[in-house]
Amino acid sequence: MGDTMWALVFDRSKDEWAKSRGLRKQQVPRPHLDVSRDYRDSGEVIVKTRYAGFCGSDRGIWFRRAFGDMMAESLDRERKDVRVVGHELLGEVVEAGPEAERDYGYKPGDVVSTESHIICNTCYQCRIGDNHVCETARIIGISHDGCFAEYVKLPAQTLWPTDVKKIRPEVAALQEPFGNAVHACTKVNLRGKSVAIIGCGTIGLFAVAVARALGARQVIGVEPMEAHIRMARALGADAVVEPSKRTESSYVHDAAITAELLRLTDGVGVDVAMEMSGSNAALNTAISAVRRGGHVIMFGLKSGDAVIEQIDKVIVEGITLHSVVGRRIFETWHITRNLLESRDPDLHDLIWKVILDEGRGTVVPFAEFEPESFERAIQVHPKVLLRF
């Protein structure tokens, strides 16, 4: 192995954030372990990337809609200009530091995925078990070099052993984003419940399948895109409500969707409404459509302020709002593994056949990466993988 490797990067010495888009494929230094120079390398691992998934946050970076400040601050701290992007990984360990081998058991040849949040283990949240909201967490591919590269250097504590005899590698590369849906769907007990999933993008589609697998009595999607409507139905949605074009204020709930969700639940409202789109109006629609005493799960992310209509309804009707970020480390990963390794129901094959379309246009060889065609792919498919 040489001293350089190919990677997809944001290079601020060549591209001004506000005036550019996409990622550059260029050679960067290949990561190495050298405990004699940096004692922290003892707990690090070098992973050879096999598959890397393109996430919604990567889309935010590609189109310069999100994470610019976080990336700039981390590059300033590291005194460099290039950030290797990407955090959804399946790879093979090629080198492990002494501590990584002794304390975590990693050795060359092990197949792993990774949690995308590098936690400190010392802040108050980490010490009480809420490490998924670590105070100083770094995010792989944003504030730490990521996996859109031939090799990636990661702390052993973030890695997750994966059996590719039980989970096909393309699906195994999606454990991290799939875990977002698992976290959302385990915030409350869904067994026997009616669930509305507002926004059937990638994580929303995962949530449809997970909610069904976890025993939801009724799963209803809300989604405008025809292709995603078909996928939601194929993944187990009993019904999918298609919103109409609207001219109202950006935060006002959709009365037509609310009426349809009430009709589908005999006028009661859904037990659980999941807002997966990041739309202020969708959040208010979720609140308006949930039953008295019900739960609203907020996963969709949008920066800035939001307006909640009729806050008195939330209080008087006993509606509980839950926010979801990332995955509970590593509780969610254990549930994810069990769901994907199970063959009843076969979520594994549903993901491969429905979301990844058995690799047709969704698995792109890294060697053939070309910005224009790749951008078309990420706009057509809910999930795209790079194969190394």
Features from the language model and the residues they span:
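N-terminal Rossmann-fold NAD(P) dinucleotide-binding loop
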Residues: G204-L205
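Glycine-rich beta-strand-centered segment in the early N-terminal region that forms part
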Residues: P31-G53, F67-Y124, D163-K165
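C-terminal hydrophobic helical "lid"/dimerization subdomain
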Residues: M1-D3, N284-I287, F330-F388
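NAD(P)H dinucleotide-binding glycine-rich loop of Rossmann-like/cofactor-binding domains
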Residues: L75-H87, C120-I198
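A generic alpha-to-beta junction signature in SAM-dependent methyltransferases
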Residues: V188-N189, T265, S277, A289-R291
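Glycine-rich phosphate-binding loop and adjacent beta-alpha segment
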Residues: R233-A234, D238, E242-P243, N280-D346, ...
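Adenosine-nucleotide cofactor-binding segment
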Residues: I197-C200, R212-L283
